[in-house]
Amino acid sequence: ALAMLLSVTAFATETAASWSVFGGNADHNAVVGKAPTTDVTVTALKLLKPDSGWDGVDTVPLMQTVGNVTYAYVLYDGHADGCTLAKINCSANTPYVVWHKQLESKSGFQLSTPLLVQGSNDNSEADDVIYAASNSGAVYKITGLQASDTDATGVEATKIYTVSKGQINTPIVSYGDYIYFGTWVGNGTIEGSTEPGRYYQVQVANVPSTSNDSYPVQSVSSIYKGFYWGGAVAVGEKVYFCGDGGYLYYRPMGDGFGTTADTDIYATSISLPSVDGNAAGDVRSTIMTKDGKLYFASKGSSIGNVYCYTIGSNGVPAFSWGAKLSCTIGNDTYSGNCTSTPVIADSGNIYVGFYSGFSAGGLMKITAPTSGTLGTASLITVEGAAFTQPVQCTPVVYTDDGMDYFYFNTNSGTGAGYCFAVLPDETDAVEMWKTDNDTYALGGMAICNGYAVFGNDYNHLYIVK
């Protein structure tokens, strides 16, 4: 897309046969145990108002398997049909759209990946809920997902909250009784004349009876502009998220999430350091966590950084190491911005996407330092040649029989979906499959039960199995 890119809860069940949040699970690690590798079948569906535009599918789909059927849900801009949620049957011999549900008539970029909260019945969607945000700043609770007709009869979208200012551009995530999301204001600062974006905690489960049917909300201010694609992660009793200006924030979950004064946020924020002389710039990546550490990437000015922070016993993160997204092969240097969330394969390897405009980029393997604080980046090549397509999404990784497979799509005028395979101790990959060239594909893939799904700006939705 030409505009730049969730979670175990106390009230939801997350299963291996689901991709219910950004990154597939509460840790946002995008690691799956089953994925299409060879002899694939590709189906390209056309959603509402297809074949043109720059603001079609800009989010990552949600997926779940109910009984023996795998479904995908995708939030997208239907142009004249407005902000729309679609349900797709991926398991049919020829995948098809089950229903479309318009949330709002207003058209525009829909950049917030929704959240699927699954109920206790694995054989029905009747007790499942989707939380989705529109580009107008409204958050919807969507029920009746079991509907089976194209007009979505029985699907109800209830507006539960509207932000006062800005766009909701982050994934919606959930921990405990709460959902979390952030807003972005293009020119705001915490002590300036224009207020910046905010991060919100909305209580959607175990709501106290004194709330008069409303959902209790707390929020904190960003220091600079706001939050763009920066999805939150929770570890222990704290919630962590990143924003523009190169800041990492940490707040207590629950009653203490908000601040008395906006400027109190300084006490629980960290200004990210430069890495090898390269300033952080904005952070437009969701945080991934593994083994008590936080991993994320910064966009940078022209070159991004990957960061690793260790969570202390008091929940306060401390800088562990960083890597600048630049490497040299022969006489050629490869580098770029980053909005991709780093992923750690079961092999232990760290992979991340990068881009430079809409015509260059690729994938890098990140190696943590054995001593010191400076990691290294290595370009993933394909059969000895540089792969130089822009990758703004978060790759999905699958490790099988000693091989790392990663799945991603490219945000270029000929954008497509790819599967690469590489030995864990190598950086030269083999292309396993590729969809036909199409158009800008920003949001990344979701993979569930062996099905890979992604969309693009032309409202083309690809199902690979």
Q: Where are the predicted features?
A:
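Extracytoplasmic/lumenal domain signature
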Residues: 13-58, 62-465
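Bacterial N-terminal signal peptides
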Residues: 1-7
